[in-house]
């Protein structure tokens, strides 16, 4: 929309993942006629961080390139073209521009721009340097601005670490438009949400363990009280609020996998917490799974039916995943990152035709010493 309003010609769209690149390209194609585009990305350039959503370029189902000469030819020959690229591959675009006669961009769009903020990296900060990527205008967009505190900036300066701050107007410019969650909800752009804190105390757990021998049902694996409380809290929220589609977030990939493997077994071992006749299906995804396996699990959340579907992950579903059918998310393990929390919440407040609220489930284990 903004490209059309500005009547921009040559445009660069930067995104942090191949998955989000693919989604964005499809949206642009559906809304544009005669769009001339090229995708710049490389498997080698994609970060392999903890549970990042990693997709092989060959799995995108579209033509991609990492050839600088091909990128350069596109820049010269397609004055109204659009280059879609990951931030990680943006140095290839800069290299293609670094020749006489290669035009600058009319517009550069940096999506999920909070990923640029922080410690400067060669790839992600490339777009901030007009000597590398030449452009008339730059537009940065994010749902979760990442503002560095004075203490963090001072420490970085003391350690001679270059940082990019979103509040630095010389890098990111002025704020053009801001829309917060509450206003978006009031304008019916997002659905409202409700935070559900589910407390489970120690006597509840101990009495059920004694009565039902939960430990022995788990093939000899010992399960601590906190983990048991998390399972009970989730099942209680699902039953109390009639939830059908739920994503759980965990500290790590192993914890997410274990939760998926044992959830139904644990819950159904507790007389008072059992799902009873309810059909409950669990699944698990992580960043380095084959894309076909991941997509199967995601698509299950988008099907209609009365069965309960729970999909566990560490963080690969936090950013750039659109599942309007989602009823709830559950933070099974505590989260400290404000950006990670906001991104995860963003998954459950997407509107659909029948959803009035999204639910954010926070299990709380109350041990013997807690009230």
Task: Locate each region found by the language model.
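Conserved C-terminal RecA-like helicase domain
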Residues: 7, 14-16, 21-82, 92-95, ...
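Conserved P-loop NTPase catalytic core
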Residues: 127-134, 147, 152-194
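Substrate-gripping "pore-loop 1 plus following alpha2 helix"
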Residues: 63-67, 101, 115-129, 152-167, ...
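Conserved interdomain linker/interface between the two RecA-like ATPase lobes of SF2 helicase motors
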Residues: 169-254
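A short beta-strand-to-loop transition that corresponds to the Sensor-1 phosphate-sensing loop
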Residues: 17, 84-89, 112, 141-145, ...
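Conserved RecA-like P-loop NTPase helicase motor core
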Residues: 116, 286-371
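SF2 helicase catalytic motif II
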Residues: 87-89, 98-140, 144-147
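Motif I (Walker A/P-loop) of helicase-class P-loop NTPases
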Residues: 1-3
């Amino acid at each position: 929309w903004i490209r059309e309003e500005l009547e921009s010609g040559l445009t660069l769209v930067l995104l942090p993942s191949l998955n989000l690149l693919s989604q964005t390209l499809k949206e642009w194609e559906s809304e544009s006629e005669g769009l001339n585009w090229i995708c710049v990305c490389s498997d080698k350039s994609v970060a392999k961080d903890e549970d990042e959503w990693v997709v092989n370029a060959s799995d995108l189902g579209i033509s991609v390139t990492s050839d600088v000469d091909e990128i350069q030819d596109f820049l010269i020959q397609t004055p109204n073209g659009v280059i879609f690229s990951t931030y990680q591959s943006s140095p290839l675009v800069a290299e293609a521009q670094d020749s006489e006669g290669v035009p600058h961009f009319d517009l550069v769009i940096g999506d999920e721009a909070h990923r640029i903020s922080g410690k400067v990296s060669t790839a992600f900060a490339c777009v901030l340097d007009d000597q590398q990527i030449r452009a008339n205008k730059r537009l940065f967009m994010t749902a979760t601005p990442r503002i560095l505190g004075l203490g963090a900036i001072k420490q970085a300066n003391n350690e001679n670490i270059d940082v990019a701050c979103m509040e630095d107007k010389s890098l990111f410019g002025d704020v053009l438009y801001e829309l917060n969650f509450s206003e978006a909800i009031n304008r019916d752009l997002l659905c409202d949400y409700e935070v559900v804190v589910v407390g489970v105390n120690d006597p509840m757990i101990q009495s059920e363990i004694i009565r039902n021998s939960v430990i022995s049902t788990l093939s000899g694996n010992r399960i601590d009280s906190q983990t048991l409380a998390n399972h009970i809290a989730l099942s209680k929220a699902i039953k109390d609020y009639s939830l059908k589609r739920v994503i759980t977030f965990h500290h790590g990939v192993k914890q997410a996998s274990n939760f998926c493997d044992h959830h139904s077994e644990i819950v159904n071992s507790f007389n008072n917490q059992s799902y009873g006749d309810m059909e409950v299906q669990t699944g698990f995804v992580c960043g380095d799974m084959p894309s076909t396996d991941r997509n199967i699990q995601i698509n299950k959340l988008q099907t209609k039916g009365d069965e309960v579907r729970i999909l566990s992950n560490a963080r690969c579903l936090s950013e750039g995943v659109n599942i309007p059918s989602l009823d709830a998310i559950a933070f099974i393990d505590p989260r400290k990152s404000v950006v990670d929390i906001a991104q995860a919440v963003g998954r459950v407040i997407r509107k659909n035709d029948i959803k009035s609220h999204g639910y954010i489930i926070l299990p709380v284990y109350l041990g013997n010493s807690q009230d």
